[in-house]
Amino acid sequence: MWKREKMWMIKPPTEHPKECKYRPVLESLVPRDPMSRFSLKRSSPKEEFPNLDRNYTLMGAILDLHMYTRQFNRATESGVIFDDIIRPGLEDPGLLNGPKSVGCLAGDAQSYILFCDFFDRIIESYHGYRVTSDAVQESDFNYDNLKGGDYFDEDYVLSCEVSAGRAVDDFCFPVHCSRGERRNLLALAQTVLEQLSEDLPGTFHSIEELSCESEERRVVMDSPPSSLIKTGVARDWPDGRALWLSKDGSLAIWVNMEEHLKLVSFRSDGNLQEAFKCVCINLMKTEILYKKLRHPFIWKHHLGWVVSSPAEVGTGLKTSVTVKLLHLAENKRLKDILDRLRLRMEETACDLSVCLYDDDRRKRALVSGYVTVIPNLNATEALQPWLDRGCPGIYNISNLQTIGFNEVELTQLVVDGVKLIIRMEKRLENKSSIEDLVPTKK
């Protein structure tokens, strides 16, 4: 009764002529939910939740049904869903006593925004750095600010390496990109590196060409590393991949491997200062060249330089020094010392995929995880020392985190840490105590 009597008091919404006219246009401008474009035959999140038993990655430790449910129906504009993000950790679950990996890869830059609940926790767990909206990741390429990196005790330091990864805007990351995207990235990189060669002479090698002409070019080429195969980054190998090498052997630039671009400088004399300087200078040059082509490197104010692996966001920088340690490696306080120094120490292992021989027989070597440039020797004889370098007592010491510090600060941590570790090793050789050398938390 009340409804019939009072209905006249309820006025219908007022419709303005212009609103009626432009409503279809306005509605067409509303971004469409990317997930609505898919017709995936999936069950409920509970039924689709992955089996994480015996998964020893950070993804396996952090992911639960509640978080999985929140991410389940989300997709980025390029079609990355949450199952794509965690698939690397499901394919490679890690080992119980092995190094802890993140167990996930971003498919594109938007992944870090759309799946921020998950990625922020991964970053905090791996780097010990809490991501906040008001935090700003700083960057510093002033290599002159690095102190003491030009000299290490050569009786202990065998070599050093500095590498930096970058992702190019408007392209999906390697784990998700299409063949066409990868080839476009290759063409873009070739244009940039041709211009870079005007300042630092170098040669551009397509991995596909190297595989076909290995006998003529004296190149030893193996299959891609197992880590790239498991994560799906090695799809369509070797299509769209390339290597640029400077003629003086100071710099290697990888295209479309783990990242869109990776610069590596290796020094067999242990001069970390020069390796860091080489990467900084050429990284800034390539950044300018990519900007001119309207494809800048991806930067987020709270994450810094964004790449596919959350283990490398921030600076994308890895600084490593190969050292000989026979005593400290067996010390029970080693893990605590490394934690205090914010460093990681791993036994060396040969991960050799490409071997280029020097035509002019100059004594030089460049190692970047995939490539070694060595003197012109018989292939078996030349490779044997590198295949044997996983011997006990030889370790790589590198920065543990890549975010929360700028490039100079991270490299300085490695310089200071390695020098302190060498002092401890000398003490232990003389059977003396190292307790007074144990540092406070950096």
List where the protein language model places each region.
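Short glycine-/aliphatic-rich beta-strand segments at the starts of folded cytosolic domains
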Residues: T319-L325
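Long, Pro/Ser/Thr-rich low-complexity/intrinsically disordered regulatory tracts in eukaryotic proteins
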Residues: W2-G304, S309-P310, L317, A329-R361, ...
